[in-house]
Amino acid sequence: MDAILSGKSGKMMTQAVEKKGVKIIGWTENGFRELTTSKGPITKPEDLRGLKIRVVGSPIFIETFRALGANPVNMNWSEATTGFQQGVVDGQENPTNGINIPLKIWDYHKFHCDWHYIIDPLMLGVNPRVWKSFSPEDQKLLLECAAETEKYGKALSRLGMDDGSALAYLKSIGKLPETTDCYAVMEANGMTVSRLSNEQIAALAKATEGVRKDWTAKIGADLVKAGE
């Protein structure tokens, strides 16, 4: 993710958004969107067949789960927990540290799958006219704050999943959250955690290859190639 945002593709995305009238002053992230279910562990495409999965209403999410044989359900997040309780849906996908841990997803689902199928980048944007109204000194201060926000947001989303850098950084600024090991917390609350191998992830990617091709054409092959 860092390589993409600091490289050619990140610059291309920033330019594309700024052409639409938004000044980008930074990037952070909400983490990989992982899968939780009530029906059983997910380790291969076949495990998703027939499952009703609550997804964001974006077409790329819906098409991805359909390609895997699941039944994606576009449901507002405000209705999701009720849907879990009533069995309207069998699972959902969301960032672990940002959503699943605070929600205590183990109250609804007992199976977690780390498959890294998509990551949530977050743009820090401002109205260009408002930005130009600030003094150079204030702009500099805001850019410094944005840079700190980038580091803080990334550390929160990666905590317990990286090489320990996130933990060290959050300790250094005195901002450690209550949960520092998401996997241990999920397992302690009765969840089965499946951390997929590269081979297992490749099988899921192969099953959604058609979706990738379609969206490469829509997004732009040059941008996708730059990101690769």
List where the protein language model places each region.
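N-terminal secretory/targeting leader peptides
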Residues: 1, 11-228
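Core domains of carbohydrate- and sulfate-ester-processing enzymes
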Residues: 5-9
